[in-house]
């Protein structure tokens, strides 16, 4: 594939794998796509292969850093990042200034620095903004979202985890048609 065709080529290769192994391409994309390099969508190749071969969609993330390191950054400034992470868990992108980070992990002294570290570690994706050094970060896919949920459990952020857990339960009970549970919850 030439440069202009890379995105389509990567997407087509993943589609071919899904077709060959009778897997749902849309689910694979939800779980393992989401990073971008310029205009090229990047899938997590290891996770795609694991999911395609096993037939199970799940967290195959090879941690680039121990969960403790991630939770340390998430707990920056006594949990000031909770609101930012909550926004990202809901699917929003948040603005970040990556130019303030000095690539020194001992000098994480702002929310922007903490988010930039998480971008470097692969836990967040980044979209370049109009101004140099500014952009937006977001949780790229379901697989990484699960890593954040694991970190939230580790940190015991009940005010974030409980609504996520309750929302999941409400969704499951709605699919079952459990009107009594739905009425009680709402």
Residue map of PLM features:
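Extended alpha-helical interface modules used as scaffolds for assembling large macromolecular complexes
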Residues: 43, 48-186
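Conserved AAA+ ATPase small/helical "lid" subdomain
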Residues: 14-59
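Short linear sequence elements within intrinsically disordered, low-complexity coil regions
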Residues: 5, 37, 65-66
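Single conserved hydrophobic/aromatic residue that forms the stacking wall/gate
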Residues: 1-10
């Amino acid at each position: 594939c030439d440069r202009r065709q890379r995105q389509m080529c990567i997407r087509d290769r993943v589609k071919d794998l899904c077709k060959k192994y009778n897997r749902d391409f849309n689910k694979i994309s939800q779980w393992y796509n989401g990073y971008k390099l310029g205009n090229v969508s990047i899938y997590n190749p290891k996770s795609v292969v694991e999911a395609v071969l096993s037939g199970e969609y799940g967290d195959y993330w090879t941690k680039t850093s121990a969960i403790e390191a991630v939770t340390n950054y998430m707990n920056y400034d006594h949990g000031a990042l909770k609101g930012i992470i909550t926004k990202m868990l809901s699917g929003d992108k948040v603005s970040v200034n990556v130019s303030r980070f000095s690539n020194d992990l001992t000098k994480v002294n702002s929310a922007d620095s903490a988010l930039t570290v998480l971008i470097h570690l692969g836990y967040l994706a980044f979209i370049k903004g109009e101004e140099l050094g500014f952009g937006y970060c977001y949780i790229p896919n379901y697989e990484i979202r699960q890593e954040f949920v694991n970190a939230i459990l580790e940190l015991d952020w009940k005010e974030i985890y409980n609504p996520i857990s309750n929302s999941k339960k409400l969704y499951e009970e709605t699919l079952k048609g459990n009107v009594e549970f739905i009425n009680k919850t709402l």
